[in-house]
């Protein structure tokens, strides 16, 4: 059984945490994130460590304990280091480009697919077959990357599509002739 919630989080220098009711605000060199946490979980900041505690050992409180601790740890990492996801476009004629603040994908449809840049995210296209998404919120970065990947997920026969960098696509064999 996981005991993530019992681990203390080390707060790096330059990062400041404030709690007002159920709202936790983390401020650091890369920005500021505010998130609400479960009201049954209490957070104590002692020096350069944040500790979390729960009132009892019910299954719901145990789950919220670990989730809350992980969310706050991700907030701290986001404002100090940031998060980054890289995507690759594999396929003949598959291209990505930036037009102003719009990401434009040409991935085999009769029309280009456009995405507006989200608030708090930096989208870059280093070359025509790679997309880089950076931000301080792990959830926002991952959601936006998943939304882009969902336009044309990698197919198992030729491996064409949009994939995360380093993602291994399980390949299938084609039909055999008679």
From Swiss-Prot:
One term under GO cellular component: cytosolic large ribosomal subunit
An annotated Gene Ontology molecular function: structural constituent of ribosome
SUPFAM superfamilies: Ribosomal protein L6
Annotated family: Belongs to the universal ribosomal protein uL6 family.
Function (record text): This protein binds to the 23S rRNA, and is important in its secondary structure. It is located near the subunit interface in the base of the L7/L12 stalk, and near the tRNA binding site of the peptidyltransferase center.
Keyword Transferase: no
Gene3D superfamilies in the cross-refs: Ribosomal protein L6, alpha-beta domain
Protein name per UniProt: Large ribosomal subunit protein uL6
Keywords of the record: Ribonucleoprotein, Ribosomal protein, RNA-binding, rRNA-binding
Matches recorded under HAMAP family: Ribosomal_uL6_B
GO biological process: cytoplasmic translation
Gene this protein is translated from: rplF
Quaternary structure annotation from Swiss-Prot or TrEMBL: Part of the 50S ribosomal subunit.
